[in-house]
Amino acid sequence: MRVILASTSPRRSQILSLLGIEFEVIPAKVEEEVIPGKPVLTARKLAKEKALSVWRENRDAVVIGADTLVFLGNEIIGKPKDEKDAVNILKKLSGKWHSVVTALCVYSPEKVFLTHDIAKVKFRELSKEEIISYVKSGEPMDKAGAYGVQGFGATIVERIHGNFYTVMGLPIVKLYKILRELNLLAGTFS
């Protein structure tokens, strides 16, 4: 059966590749509207919309959609709009714990799965110079919360409670269980 990742995120492709299955990438076309104060609900809604938008034209396939949001309290912190926004986001998160939710929706011809995972992340205290230098690197610009835990952003993360891959953008443990249930992981360990 065809497996499609409804995302152009190189991080999600990298994580999905860890499961050793062949897949294709078809970008989802959805308006990413946020429900203010509802980060988990927003992430679940967007993951479902992304998967559904691709599945509608590929009903014979298994389509994987995901959405990652960073939040502080109930304030959703999305991708930075520009460098100034990235600096402000990183200042806000400096020295604090925040949460990362990645929602996952899998459409198959037989069944729809919708789940999410949450991890807590603590930044170390960041100097203004560190923030500006990191933003100038360009790494934060396409990432929720303005950092990439798998890149140089790892140097600003002091601690993670939860799954690293949830923070990176795809909850691999939950996805693994779904794909096993769909019998798409033949030959992997049991």
Swiss-Prot record:
The active site is at D67. Its cofactor is a divalent metal cation. GO terms for molecular function: dTTP diphosphatase activity; nucleoside triphosphate diphosphatase activity; UTP diphosphatase activity. It is an enzyme of class 3 (hydrolase). This is dTTP/UTP pyrophosphatase. One of its GO terms (biological process) is nucleotide metabolic process. GO terms for cellular component: cytoplasm. It is found in: Cytoplasm. Nucleoside triphosphate pyrophosphatase that hydrolyzes dTTP and UTP. May have a dual role in cell division arrest and in preventing the incorporation of modified nucleotides into cellular nucleic acids. InterPro entries: ITPase-like_fam, Maf-like. Its EC number is 3.6.1.9. Keywords: Cytoplasm, Hydrolase, Nucleotide metabolism. Belongs to the Maf family. YhdE subfamily. The record marks R11, T68, Q150 as: Important for substrate specificity. It catalyses: dTTP + H2O = dTMP + diphosphate + H(+); UTP + H2O = UMP + diphosphate + H(+). It comes from the Bacteria.
